[in-house]
Regions:
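Nucleotide-activated donor-binding/catalytic signature segment of Leloir-type glycosyltransferases, i.e.
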Residues: 274-316, 378
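Conserved donor-binding/catalytic core segment of Leloir-type glycosyltransferases
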Residues: 227-244, 250-253, 266
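A short, well-ordered alpha-helix in the C-terminal region of glycosyltransferases
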Residues: 389-392, 396, 403-417
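Carbohydrate-associated surface elements
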Residues: 40, 184, 202-205
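A short helix/loop element that forms part of the nucleotide-sugar donor recognition site in Leloir-type
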Residues: 52-58, 212-227
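Nucleotide-sugar-dependent
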Residues: 14, 244, 309-318, 325-346, ...
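N-terminal subdomain of nucleotide-sugar transferases
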Residues: 1-58, 256
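Membrane-proximal helix-turn-helix segments that form the acceptor-binding/catalytic region
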Residues: 118-121, 125-131, 158-180
């Protein structure tokens, strides 16, 4: 079996890269070869690293049974038009490789991610244009155009929404299997006419042996960024974008700054809202710039610290940094999603502080998950946009440290019972095996 990947991203600075890495290790253990076509990476890389990647256009890794073909593409940047153009040009090149490249033509099945949203339609065209009509497995991590409606970028019935729905239907109709990351996703696409037998639910797992609790006295991030170990920390880890409701988070931090100076917020990541957030905090608060030993820069604005993405090998330190960790979004954004960072929070034995749309996440955090007979509360859930309830949830955990620890232990147990790396990767293996002849 030989698997073809046509991707707009490659490298360790993609949020879900550990999932792909775990999955691909499982594929290699089956004796399956993998062929990748992708643009030269730029996300999270220095100029020197980008130049180096452009020189090394084909990467062979016999141990991992992978061949990665990179084609030259301009850097991603933060401008939305520039990013959209990069995605479009990349998709055109990937289509060309998928149909005509010798290495791609020797593959038996395609495994395609849903990000960016045109990837599925591109893969469907590859399938149609190849004589062998190569089977196409679609991994649905984000539902488009629903996500655009949720962020307020468009509305149902608009021209953009109609185009998005056509792309969505074309993709679903041509996919041989669709892997979704939650029961909510499954219900969503079934309501759009996708037959149930085409859908497989595979939750985004966490490597329970990699993401573990790191005691505060051993957590190196406190020393790297000059954080006071005696404070109560609320952390956010991931994309700092337009949908994460950073405005509300800043309002809550401002309100707690005087009444509860021991509560400190730490945001680890980057994204489209990063520059706006830094400018906003600079205009309101006193800034302290921190130079970490590795050369990276961080900022502290009174009771809010902004740290850059950390290497994956430090993921346990990142998710163990806080006393509690956030899963947060604007209303309407997360109706059908359970962010995979939730599992990392739980695996690190930290309580989940969720301010999110009411969906499967609420059941899991409150301990009412129908998918587990042993589920117990592992945090506090509040409705997306409810600032007062969110602030009250923070104070509840701040005033009851034993409850924090209990929720953390419950979350870790839920992961061990339901969301281990072995369970998730085996489900992917089973899907691929269904296409073996």
């Amino acid at each position: 079996m030989k698997i073809l990947f046509l991707s707009s991203y490659v490298g360790s600075h993609v949020a879900s890269s550990h999932l792909a890495s775990n999955r691909n290790v499982a594929f290699a253990k089956q004796g399956w070869d993998m062929v990748f076509y992708a643009p030269t990476p730029s996300r999270g890389l220095t100029k020197e690293e980008i130049k180096k990647s452009r020189k090394n256009r084909t990467i062979y890794n016999s141990e991992k049974r992978q061949v990665i073909h990179l084609f030259r593409m301009f850097s991603e940047g933060k401008n939305s038009i520039q990013r959209a153009l990069r995605y479009t040009l990349s998709a055109i090149k990937e289509f060309n490789r998928g149909v005509f490249a010798k290495d791609a033509r020797s593959c038996n099945v395609m495994l395609i991610s849903s990000t960016p949203p045109i990837q599925g339609a591109m893969a469907a065209m590859v399938k149609k244009c190849r004589r062998d009509h190569i089977p196409f497995i679609y991994v649905l991590q984000d539902i488009f155009p629903d996500s655009l409606v949720g962020t307020g970028m468009t509305h149902k019935g608009s021209l953009l929404w109609k185009i998005g729905r056509r792309i969505e239907n074309f993709t679903y109709n041509n996919a041989d299997k669709i892997i979704v990351i939650s029961q909510d996703f499954k219900r969503n696409i079934m309501a759009k006419g996708v037959p149930e037998e085409k859908i497989v639910v595979i939750y985004n797992w966490v490597d329970q042996n990699v993401v573990v609790d790191v005691p505060r006295e051993k957590n190196k991030l406190f020393d790297m960024y000059g954080l006071d170990r005696s404070k109560f920390y609320i952390t956010y880890n991931g994309n700092i974008g337009l949908t994460q409701n950073m405005e509300m988070l800043c309002e809550v931090a401002k309100e707690l700054e005087v009444s509860n100076p021991d509560i400190h917020f730490v945001l680890v990541g980057t994204g489209a809202y990063w520059d706006t957030l830094v400018a906003k905090l600079r205009s309101e608060k006193q800034e302290v710039k921190i130079q970490a030993p590795d050369g990276s820069e961080a900022f502290t604005f009174d009771n809010i610290s902004l740290l850059p993405f950390q290497p994956y090998e430090d993921i346990s330190h990142v998710f163990s940094l806080g006393d509690a960790s956030l899963v947060i979004s604007k209303p309407g954004v997360g109706e059908n999603s359970v962010p995979s960072k939730t599992w990392s929070i739980m695996s690190a034995s930290r309580p989940v502080l969720a301010n999110f749309d009411e969906n499967e996440l609420k059941e899991i955090v409150s301990g009412a998950s129908t998918g587990s007979a042993t589920a117990k509360p592992c945090g506090i859930f509040t409705k997306a946009g409810d600032k007062e309830a969110f602030k009250e949830a923070i104070l509840t955990l701040y005033n009851n440290r034993e409850l924090c620890k209990e929720y953390g232990r419950n979350g870790r147990q839920f992961v061990m019972d339901n969301l281990t790396r072995e369970v998730g990767t085996q489900k992917y293996v089973d899907v691929i095996k269904s296409f073996e002849k």
